[in-house]
């Protein structure tokens, strides 16, 4: 699991253990970085270790883990009523080649937060975002914050701009790569143009929390981040309480806003010696009452239609998954490296995208 600083996960697991003394769950806390937790699971599964019965599984791990034969097929275990209540895109993201391997728990999507006390009419296009950022930034406040560190967050940020220009990355079915198309160049040029103008020079070192803390301290007009930020800005001790709105990410004229789909769910290791007990826990922790409790404690958005707050519905309808390919981690690493090189002025955007496209084609094949 992720680090349990609030004790929320421990509370839920204790409830399960009290109800099922014959199927007790022991929580293993992993490191905070998602890719490091992925490595933790991968190392165990490569040795066919049964040390992990249940996997708290990121949306992008499913194709890799399934292709490697590490997860149990859960297609015939999930009741029809639950299938109807879980969000469609989250069910798809937990599936591979038509079979379900991960039961959704929490959904997520990229969103644009803005200071509604400053901006009366929120931006719809990339040009609007620049214009409004320039108008309202000052010596104490930047215009636009995002996540530019070399990690998966950079990919999710870039994809939303890329999709907003009408472009794409990889077609999971045909393995076609689109990174050397004009739309990708426009997207990277836009992202690069924000650095030092409407975004701080240090934005290329920011992950979610660095950018969120600055925005929540009142030091920016706009923030691209995930849905969890909404609850944090509304807390009593938040300096921007009651002054924040959220809208879909901006897009090019004539194009459509798209958000990167994120989210977490629960899968079962193929190497478990306790598949029935593991399934009991997956059933329990994805129940509406447990997901609602975690939402109230952590701000996580339940992946059930019956529990999604209405203000998030337009955002989630625009959410799009990243390519469901077993080579996803390597493809993401390629894109991260070349985007970072271009943002740091080590290479031109044109060169970065051309090389990223070439390496990605070699990786995924025709």
Say what each PLM segment does.
Residues 75-86, 148-149, 167-186, 235-239, ...:
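Short, solvent-exposed loop/beta-turn-alpha elements that line the ligand-binding surface or hinge
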Residues 317-366:
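Conserved C-terminal helix/tail region of periplasmic/extracytoplasmic solute-binding proteins
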Residues 1-63, 80, 238, 253, ...:
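Conserved N-terminal structural module of periplasmic/extracytoplasmic solute-binding proteins
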Residues 18, 26, 185, 189, ...:
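Extracytoplasmic/periplasmic substrate-recognition and gating elements
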Residues 29-41, 60, 126-128, 202-216:
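Short helix-initiation/N-cap motifs at beta->coil->alpha
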Residues 57-109, 121, 127-130, 241-247, ...:
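Hinge/lid segment of periplasmic solute-binding proteins
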Residues 132-135, 173-205, 249:
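Glycine-centered hinge/linker elements that transmit conformational signals in sensory
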Residues 101-105, 110, 130-177, 183, ...:
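Extracytoplasmic/periplasmic solute-binding protein
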